[in-house]
A protein has these predicted regions:
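Residue-level recognition of transmembrane alpha-helices
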Residues: 7, 25-26, 74, 93, ...
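Hydrophobic alpha-helical transmembrane segments of multi-pass membrane transport/permease proteins
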Residues: 10, 14-48, 67-82, 121, ...
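Hydrophobic alpha-helical transmembrane segments of multi-pass membrane transport proteins
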Residues: 31, 35, 62-141
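Alpha-helical transmembrane segments and their short interhelical loops
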Residues: 109, 117-194
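Short, membrane-interfacial amphipathic segments enriched in basic
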Residues: 1-9, 165, 210-216
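Perimembrane loop-to-helix junctions flanking transmembrane segments
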Residues: 47-62
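Residue-level recognition of membrane-helix boundary sites in multi-pass small-molecule transporters
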Residues: 20-21, 111, 181, 212
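Transmembrane helix segments
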Residues: 34-43, 173-227
Length: 232
């Protein structure tokens, strides 16, 4: 257990010591929030108003629904994409040869793997909590409506999706051995995951075959959890 703790501590230190990697992970949710507010907020609002037709609706209620949609989309995407960025240390150790030095020591391979998982979960969790704080500030500007129980439920969803993103990134990055491969995978995940998990577009808008295929992916249910609790 002490070995696992020391390895996890080492990985966390290396992550936070790399200012470029840390600030890239930290600023990603903020950039996404700005993009969502700029481009998606009006789209969501127009969509809701079109469904309501001539039915009178309080403007603050519409803003609350739009805010819930935006923060759930942001958190659903960030918890996974940031995990891939945080888990780059696994690839960097292979590139620099540090993994060979670690493997010749009397450290179990399982302890080494779990240390990468734990450090990635910690780093991603910190960024996820910061992102959630930014989302709460945005809701405060729009008109805060969430109860303490709702906030705790969303926070629990963030933890759950952080663990999912960490597991997914660990399974993928385990097979990567160069920075080019890691960059390519990160680009694909950042560009496509939001569509796959239903954050950018509702799954119901997809063709029937694609919709059934996406229903087998755990990420879609993580987005649903966040939507249910953010719009409760």
């Amino acid at each position: 257990m002490k070995t696992l703790y020391n390895l996890t501590k080492r990985n966390c230190r290396l992550f936070f010591k790399d200012k470029g990697l840390f600030f890239t992970s930290l600023i990603t949710p903020a950039i996404l929030l700005v993009l969502y507010i700029t481009f998606l907020a009006k789209t969501f609002k127009d969509s809701f108003l079109s469904y309501m037709g001539d039915f009178p609706m309080n403007e603050s209620l519409i803003d609350a629904v739009v805010g819930g949609q935006l923060i759930s989309s942001l958190l659903a995407v960030s918890c996974v994409t940031v995990a891939f960025c945080s888990n780059l240390l696994m690839v960097q150790d292979k590139v620099t040869g540090s993994i060979k030095d670690l493997r010749i020591t009397p450290v179990r391979t399982s302890a080494l793997a779990v240390s990468y998982f734990c450090s990635t979960a910690v780093a991603t969790g910190i960024v996820g909590i910061v992102a959630f704080g930014l989302c709460l500030l945005y809701l405060a500007q729009m008109g805060f409506y969430m109860s303490l129980l709702d906030v705790l439920a969303v926070l629990l969803d963030v933890v759950l999706l952080t663990l999912f993103g960490t597991a997914l990134s660990s399974a993928v990055n385990f097979h990567l051995s160069t920075n080019g491969q890691a960059s390519a995978v990160g680009t694909v995940v950042s560009a496509g995951y939001g569509f796959i998990c239903g954050a950018y577009m509702p799954i119901s808008n997809y063709p029937d075959g694609l919709r059934k295929g996406l229903s087998f992916l755990p990420g879609t249910y993580g987005t649903c959890l966040l939507r249910n609790h953010a719009l409760a």
